[in-house]
Amino acid sequence: MCEYLSAVYEDVVKRNPGEPEFHQAVLEVLESLEPVLERHPEYKERGIIPMLLEPERIIKFRVPWLDDEGKIQVNRGFRVQFNSAIGPYKGGLRFHPSVYEGIIKFLGFEQIFKNSLTGLPIGGGKGGSDFDPKGKSDGEIMRFCQSYMTELYKYIGKDEDVPAGDIGVGAREIGYLYGQYKRITGLYEGVLTGKGIPYGGSLGRKQATGWGLCYFTDAMLRDRGLSFEGRTVVISGSGNVAIYAAEKAMSLGAKVVAMSDSNGYIHDPEGIDLATVKEIKEGKRGRISEYIKTRKNAEYTEGCRGIWSIPCDIALPCATQNEIDGESARALVKNGVTAVAEGANMPSTPEAIEVFLSAGVLFAPAKAANAGGVATSALEMTQNSQRLSWTLDEVDQKLHTIMTNIYENASRAAKEYGNDGNLVIGANIAGFIKVADAMMAQGAV
């Protein structure tokens, strides 16, 4: 990394202490940009990169709510409105005890590039709370969501900031949040995405991130004369992303042999019975360990790291950040993995990514590979603004086109800037240039 970019990174660390996830995300992007600055010194001269690294706005607020015992609990709420150069802020809400400002900044920063790559007019943002929905009653979750939106509504709008779901925020939570927004403002508008179909949601939104991940991976494989057909796949997670990635991988001819949740993982050498997983996770909201009650040849193992020791051709990490470390990456390479595509946000550590790239493994970074969710959210915004509802086939065709275009643009940028085949660098460059050009055109102040 050149002296200028090193100095920029050191300043980020100094100004944002105790936020390792944000530092990691920034470093990955900055390490990609040296060849861009050599060709476009105007980005340096106009101070584009330091501006891009500073959020336009950070909103932090308390969220008091009443539990079932009648006691008041207090959580912290966040919304980071990172960059609106190419459109209104767009990014999900995460409810999880690990949430703090640094994680929301990392996610919002990644969202800038991911949203840029879709080719759609959406900027980058992210929000959430350290509230833990696990173990809470439906009433408690409703009251928390209503309190959260009572503060957040002041800062969002269909043309300003459009949140969506993320970890801990599914259709139920979006419904409660949207209901409170409508109750307060009296406006029926596309201010949230991931809504239920009866009140303005889009068909295909639930499936979009997982399906899009497989469309991107398929484009990457086909560019090398490969495909999903006959391949063995390991997928971490068992939420929407993992379940619908498994569904699409199977429809493309692959055999998924392992999935996980936060407690442990299942290994079914005969192939995962996805209907059973859906019933456990979507129907009962249970633990994945229940899978082995009906699938006698399957095994359940406590803890999640071991899932990457299972031999596979394709690995799709769809659980959480930094779940694949260097050791797990080396185990995958040793067992002959051909491709790794990130369904979760930043699930591979920098060491793991280096292991994959050094071994010649096809590697699809999250900001490109999991952009299907936000792309379909933008399609939901379009339908809301036009007062239309598209069929599932229409949404799916648009999603397939968007994900294929993202792959082609990232691949082209990598080649153009001297890193052919490196989609990490290609995605960062392609996403950056569009946003940087928009910022240049609009002026610094």
Q: Where are the regions a protein language model picked out?
A:
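Glycine-rich beta-alpha junction loops
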Residues: 81-82, 126-129, 168-169, 173, ...
